[in-house]
Amino acid sequence: MAQRILVLHGPNLNLLGTREPHIYGSLTLAQIDQGLAALAGQLGVALTSWQSNHEGALVERIQAAAADGTDFIIINAAAYTHTSVAIRDALAAVAIPFIEVHLSNLYKRDSFRQHSYLSDLAIGLITGLGADGYEAALRYAARH
């Protein structure tokens, strides 16, 4: 059975391609997800990508991952990275290994964006590589 990997996209990532492309790049979320789906096919893993602007919906999807056989999570919690104890607690509760991904380099941004509630629980953190960060995370997840 193929490894099951869940990619979670947080708030405002549905606006990629038009929202501050000088920070987040010009690719849309659909283009990022299409690229990940193609790579997942090459790597022989089952991939589900999911986006929500709502904290509770992200928490519920993380909780559902514990029951649906998800083996690994790749998460860009976006703004919730810096504010959400609920998402942190959900990730801790399900104990599914995860990588935290950010399109922009958090450490070159506003000081309030430089704290993550998730990083100390994550297997790893990829920040500032644009959409390539998702691909790096997927390649790692496929091997572990």
Curated annotation (Swiss-Prot):
The protein's enzyme class: lyase
Biological pathway: Metabolic intermediate biosynthesis; chorismate biosynthesis; chorismate from D-erythrose 4-phosphate and phosphoenolpyruvate: step 3/7
Pfam families recorded: DHquinase_II (PF01220)
E.C. number: 4.2.1.10
Catalytic residues as annotated in Swiss-Prot or TrEMBL: 24, 102
Annotated catalysed reactions: 3-dehydroquinate = 3-dehydroshikimate + H2O
Molecular function terms from GO: 3-dehydroquinate dehydratase activity
InterPro entries per the UniProt record, alphabetical: DHquinase_II, DHquinase_II_CS, DHquinase_II_sf
Keyword entries, A-Z: Amino-acid biosynthesis, Aromatic amino acid biosynthesis, Lyase
Marked site positions, Transition state stabilizer: 19
GO terms under biological process: amino acid biosynthetic process; aromatic amino acid family biosynthetic process; chorismate biosynthetic process; quinate catabolic process
Residues that bind substrate: 76, 82, 89, 103-104, 113
Gene3D superfamilies the UniProt entry points to: Dehydroquinase, class II
Assembly and binders: Homododecamer.
Primary role: Catalyzes a trans-dehydration via an enolate intermediate.
Similarity field: Belongs to the type-II 3-dehydroquinase family.
Name listed for the protein in its UniProt record: 3-dehydroquinate dehydratase
Organism: Bordetella pertussis (strain Tohama I / ATCC BAA-589 / NCTC 13251)
Species lineage: Bacteria, Pseudomonadati, Pseudomonadota, Betaproteobacteria, Burkholderiales
